[in-house]
Amino acid sequence: MFSGGGGPLSPGGKSAARAASGFFVPAGPRGAGRGPPPCLRQNFYNPYLAPVGTQQKPTGPTQRHTYYSECDEFRFIAPRVLDEDAPPEKRAGVHDGHLKRAPKVYCGGDERDVLRVGSGGFWPRRSRLWGGVDHAPAGFNPTVTVFHVYDILENVEHAYGMRAAQFHARFMDAITPTGTVITLLGLTPEGHRVAVHVYGTRQYFYMNKEEVDRHLQCRAPRDLCERMAAALRESPGASFRGISADHFEAEVVERTDVYYYETRPALFYRVYVRSGRVLSYLCDNFCPAIKKYEGGVDATTRFILDNPGFVTFGWYRLKPGRNNTLAQPRVPMAFGTSSDVEFNCTADNLAIEGGMSDLPAYKLMCFDIECKAGGEDELAFPVAGHPEDLVIQISCLLYDLSTTALEHVLLFSLGSCDLPESHLTELAARGLPTPVVLEFDSEFEMLLAFMTLVKQYGPEFVTGYNIINFDWPFLLAKLTDIYKVPLDGYGRMNGRGVFRVWDIGQSHFQKRSKIKVNGMVNIDMYGIITDKIKLSSYKLNAVAEAVLKDKKKDLSYRDIPAYYAAGPAQRGVIGEYCIQDSLLVGQLFFKFLPHLELSAVARLAGINITRTIYDGQQIRVFTCLLRLADQKGFILPDTQGRFRGAGGEAPKRPAAAREDEERPEEEGEDEDEREEGGGEREPEGARETAGRHVGYQGARVLDPTSGFHVNPVVVFDFASLYPSIIQAHNLCFSTLSLRADAVAHLEAGKDYLEIEVGGRRLFFVKAHVRESLLSILLRDWLAMRKQIRSRIPQSSPEEAVLLDKQQAAIKVVCNSVYGFTGVQHGLLPCLHVAATVTTIGREMLLATREYVHARWAAFEQLLADFPEAADMRAPGPYSMRIIYGDTDSIFVLCRGLTAAGLTAVGDKMASHISRALFLPPIKLECEKTFTKLLLIAKKKYIGVIYGGKMLIKGVDLVRKNNCAFINRTSRALVDLLFYDDTVSGAAAALAERPAEEWLARPLPEGLQAFGAVLVDAHRRITDPERDIQDFVLTAELSRHPRAYTNKRLAHLTVYYKLMARRAQVPSIKDRIPYVIVAQTREVEETVARLAALRELDATAPGDEPAPPAALPCPAKRPRETPSHADPPGGASKPRKLLVSELAEDPAYAIAHGVALNTDYYFSHLLGVACVTFKALFGNNAKITESLLKRFIPEVWHPPDDVAARLRAAGFGAVGAGATAEETRRMLHRAFDTLA
């Protein structure tokens, strides 16, 4: 038998032929389900496998594009389990060789070349050109005047590389000898994909003219251009050897450095550069002694900011430019993208189309991949760099973003695949498209088909679940490392584009990735979900249950190899699992509509959506500040040497925070619409936090008066505290001075604010002297937000959603301003501004406390300010006292007043304080009134708001790593405390006396119901029939296990046990479930073996897990096995294991009847209760635990062998009495009997 390439099949080829022959004979109806009946595939091309080292590179990229439009040889890797007629011993591992034929795809009994373009393709196609051939229908010539932009690209073109006959002279001039071209990607209202190439945009930077002339002896701008060109030509390497002074243009302008009030306008050289690469080199290396300004601003930002009104996401219109010049359509053969139409123009040919707000028919692709290890251990986690570890299926759902309609469902399968009829019926019943199942002989063919779909269909938006950290990196590593496929042509650009994933560091020890694809916006729903909602587990199934009230048919990773090897029908089960994952993610996408909020932020900040997703808060504020600074004649210095000048010294870092200070709320939290929740933050000091080095003082916290308060507590909040402080006090880089002589000519108090921060005197001039740039930004944004919110009630539902996302985007950016100034290594830090904000915040808290205590010390004074207070008097003495101050909140305990009355008059009280103490726009608002409040510590409290709603903040009661049993019991105790008036009264009496007193006296009778809950909890913990699922704890795997300093953690123990048992190990960021089990001989043996595995894993290279070591599998035994077992035969007593060593996988514990550690669980419950209720006992945790234990009878749980001996001797179990006296009588009788 011979292949088309000539020559007999090698032994490897015969195996591949067997694999293919089993694959090509369909076992039943194909997954498309409702198409024509399948038939035997015709014209099967037998694989010809050559040794790996002899492969010629696949025929691929032509001169004008770098995606594959033709291929006649490729590396063939396929699992041997597809050899369905082969004996079992021949079905292990993979075929790996080279095949000389075109890549094939099979669907519904039909066969096609993957790269062939023609009618009736297996997947939808939107690209006009393919492989340099125009496939547009006859007469296709769309007229484009209006188009929507969703992405902006930039690249450098060279005149000598272009066909001058195809370009107008003005475009050739813009790239002679080289020039930056901005490409706007978008869609027309009719759905045509458009690319508009904008010529003439230039990046630039500034240098002080006096310094340049002195250092370089320049007499004219041209001299500077010559000096820069010479420096570039002399640089290492050959990159800049052809640079001449014509690459630059310099002009003299007047500007002011944004730092410090005393800085005066000066002359600067503005140097225009034709490429970002040259700009970066000059700013980093040319005359380092001379400060550079705005050298890090990219060409896209310059394009947006230098053309007022331009946006990164919105509708544009083509119009005649200067001298009536028009945009030039490109001929198809000159297209640089996979668009339907392309234009060349300059910025003056563009205008914003303000009358349109709807989105065009953008396409959304939702995908998911399934992988399988192909080595000796099929249960190992697949590694992309291993050729034998394969992608076996890819589900791909295609939506219309404007209508949310699901238009296509595709399943790419390595090997034949028959989707279950039940799944097809379910999809049809839901009105969803029938899946098209695409089958492939090899992994390369499947991956090439998927990437060909990405190129030909070109979805503008892509989503999935954890695709940024897993799916995309795995696919791209496979394509580039194993198959050597260039990816730069698979985005919207046909070549020289970007399609890559890279690590961007760690956040809270989690490795994070970033993806950039030209013309494709990737929005990972995993990141959206973890940012928007708090759950105990972020697995897709848990998220679907919590958010969508839906769940999927789960398929264990351990089952995938067996299902895959079992044939087309069982592979269809994997396919159903893969498709339903994508369906759930699609539903989540349209539930949260993340593209609307992200695009609104992008518009406001002047950056594209990809930067909005991945580049953090800093760039958003920086770009807005850059725009405003240019309007006001300021320039922003680059980071290096920022604090030179203005006194000549770098500022001292403000002192670290004291114990009574805390870090301010993180950026992104809006003080006037804050959601309650969260825990304590670590004390502020100079430290590194997720890449942020902050060194300013935190906000002052007024120490809480701990206890159980049953009188009303009014909570006043400062609305948008930090933004309002910046506005009220005119704080900014440009209004700050570190020198007293700089403001000596001004009047203190009237013209400037003097304040001491961290032991240093700072001066900020008032707005009538120089208006703060930060204040202007905040004022404009807040006014815009107010206007948008006012439109929402009168809008249609669709428009209201869009407007709500816009106002939310403004809120996010507003709350980023304060944090922007406080990051020491940020884009434009000013720690003095950040420290001043928190200092003023502390002073405001103290001023409010003094005012309330003095102004309303007597009821008559309150009545004088608020006559309506006469109707809010309650029995008992009157007093008003602040019991807690928390960054931007003030808690006021009001005795002798009703909660209803305080709620009614609260806003008036807040306004009164605001007018008396603060400058506008700072204002207090009455946020809520607690009827009962358990105040535990800073940022830890539980209370019932007037109206009945309970609010819990910072308390273990709601921690997601507690088990369900402890959470339920804790919640029951809290409900009793707040909603049972008898218990509430007893608790209040308890809290009024010193805790030590209760050690010598009985607890109040009203706490009996409270104790009954604890007794019932103890009974349930010791019940042999308990449900283990109620006792499952979870902890997040925040980084690779080797990266943990403390290895003695419960969830790490379970991780290594799963590894040793060859089970699927969790991924980083997953929450690992575990239970704590009793210490037995089997557990001790497991711990010993696990220690060896940890040692082995610590020395394993890279991120690959160590080879598993077998763990003992205990015989099934009753769950009531005791917590501790006596050593047999009088042997030495074994070491008591750590709690972390007793952690076990819940599924394993259930399957093997492993006993729970009842002592641990009850101790843990008491620990949680002590943390919650210690405020009743003066915050003395030791006394709290001692008193709570009074409710629990002392019960000894003997080991099995001891219990058997006692029964044999005639002893019986005696339970506790209903009361302490009854128990005492029973014990007295027992001891008399024993005596």
From Swiss-Prot:
A single cellular component GO annotation: host cell nucleus
Q: What are the TM regions of this chain, as residue ranges?
A: none
A Gene Ontology biological process annotation? DNA-templated DNA replication
Q: Where is the composition biased (Acidic residues)?
A: 662-675
**Disordered: annotated segments:** 640-692, 1098-1134
| Top-level taxon | Viruses
Q: Please report any disulfide bonds recorded for this protein chain, giving both cysteine positions.
A: none
Q: Where is the composition biased (Basic and acidic residues)?
A: 650-661, 676-691
- Grouped into one coarse class, the protein's main location is host cell
| Gene Ontology molecular function terms on file | DNA binding; DNA-directed DNA polymerase activity; nucleotide binding; RNA-DNA hybrid ribonuclease activity
Q: Could you list this entry's UniProt keywords, alphabetically sorted.
A: DNA replication, DNA-binding, DNA-directed DNA polymerase, Endonuclease, Host nucleus, Hydrolase, Multifunctional enzyme, Nuclease, Nucleotidyltransferase, Transferase, Viral DNA replication
Enzyme Commission number, as recorded? 2.7.7.7, 3.1.26.4
Kindly state which reaction or reactions the protein catalyses. DNA(n) + a 2'-deoxyribonucleoside 5'-triphosphate = DNA(n+1) + diphosphate; Endonucleolytic cleavage to 5'-phosphomonoester
Self-association and partners: Forms a complex with the ssDNA-binding protein UL29, the DNA polymerase processivity factor, and the alkaline exonuclease. Interacts with the putative helicase-primase complex subunit UL8; this interaction may coordinate leading and lagging strand DNA synthesis at the replication fork.
Q: Sum up the protein's function in the record's words.
A: Replicates viral genomic DNA. The replication complex is composed of six viral proteins: the DNA polymerase, processivity factor, primase, primase-associated factor, helicase, and ssDNA-binding protein. Additionally, the polymerase contains an intrinsic ribonuclease H (RNase H) activity that specifically degrades RNA/DNA heteroduplexes or duplex DNA substrates in the 5' to 3' direction. Therefore, it can catalyze the excision of the RNA primers that initiate the synthesis of Okazaki fragments at a replication fork during viral DNA replication.
Q: Which family does it belong to?
A: Belongs to the DNA polymerase type-B family.
Protein name from the UniProt record:
DNA polymerase catalytic subunit
The lineage, from the top, is: Viruses, Duplodnaviria, Heunggongvirae, Peploviricota, Herviviricetes
